[in-house]
Amino acid sequence: MRISPLALLFAVACGPFSLAVETKNDAPTTHEASFQYENGQLAQDPLAMGSMPSNDLQDSPRHRQEKAHLMKRMDSKHGKWSSTHPRYRLLEALFGFTKYRERNMAELDRWRKLYKNVGKKQKKTLEKVVDYTKKLDDIEELIYKNEVVCKSIMTNAMQFYNIDQEELNEHINKATQDGRQADKMSVSQTLKHFVRDWADEGSKERNEAFPCILSTLESLKTSHDSDAPLKVLLPGSGLGRLGHEVATLGGFEVTVNEWSMYMNIGYRFIDAHTTEDQVTIHPFIDGMSHHAITSDMFRGLSIPFSSPNPEVLLVEGDFNSAFNGQEDHFDIIVTHFFIDTARNLMAYFDTIHRLLKPGGTWVNFGPLLYGTGPFVQLSLDEILAVVEDMGFEFEDMSEECGELTFEGKKVRSKQSEYGFNRKALTRNAYLAQTWLVRKV
């Protein structure tokens, strides 16, 4: 899971124990639920909190086969039990969503304690002019609203993966005994990714990247001389919007892949809805910085549930191993904000080359923001040289994908934001590098 640079900077500044974002060993990568209070507790809408069925349209042989494989991999007796086991990582993600309110209330309590250090005269001014205590109380109310959404996400995931409450409670109790806290940041980043992938507000960030990728795929489809759909793989797919856009083009058999269980249970939540409905989240209440007006921080964003494309298949797990046995299988691999998440960049390149058919194409769009412990960190010119040496041939892309980065080289640069909050008083953008290469 890619986290925002601001979140990463905050985590690094706070010390080595603050960054609890889910990582992996071989790679860094309905209606609005109603709520009310009863006796000071959150009363949950039973309709909103009930079990939500998976999309019945997704009943193709490949979906059924992958679900069977997934449940086999999820069995605690399958493979070695450790913190990298998919069931353990799933329980950790459910732990995180379970403790959303607790972790965020702890931070709010810290803000309230800090406010007590303000002098009486200063506090009187703050209360009169901006009603600062009410501001903190409003944040608490929105934490409770977000908790309802988190519980809906969790309920859907527990049904999909067949996890019962007793097993989750045992995992949480063990974590508590070991002194481990739930991962606050990964849950927060997942809520923000709902904005980037599915909310109207995320359209600006999507529109800076998607047109280049989609038009490139359209041109590849046009030159395809068979009626069979082109097999496309999108690793590091997050909450899946790009994969669904590719499927909507027609003529593609789309497979998306994601390691992060936080992202995967978020995707399952989106995918469980087959009607045009929506849920509202308040994703920006976990930080006080960079807000022009307080209502920007408090605003709710609607996440629409338009009917998902039933042909998209999610394969969970590590990109480098999830597709073992599928050598020379895919016509196209699309890496969108992905390759720099690698622990071992060369392993990603090897996997891309291994999975592509001879003559298959790799489309890349993204930055080179390496994580905290990569085995190798290459500059762009080094990447181009390595990729060519591995047996890839660069082909030019349209000007829609940006200007040429190097004279005489078929790689382009396009500015692309990655910040989630379009109203923030800060901007984080990259000169994303775009290329199209063919396996020769």
Q: PLM ranges: what are they?
A:
Residues 281, 285-286, 368-369, 373-404, ...:
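Conserved Class I S-adenosyl-L-methionine
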Residues 359-371:
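Conserved beta-strand signature within the Rossmann-like core of class I S-adenosyl-L-methionine
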Residues 271-326:
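S-adenosyl-L-methionine
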Residues 390-391, 406-440:
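Core SAM-dependent methyltransferase catalytic element
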Residues 320-333, 427:
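A short acidic, Gly/Pro-enriched loop at the edge of an enzyme's catalytic core
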Residues 225-238, 245, 253-258:
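Conserved class I S-adenosyl-L-methionine
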Residues 2-226, 230:
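N-terminal accessory segments
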Residues 346-359:
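A short glycine-rich, Lys/Arg-flanked "PGG" loop and its adjoining helix->strand segment in the class I
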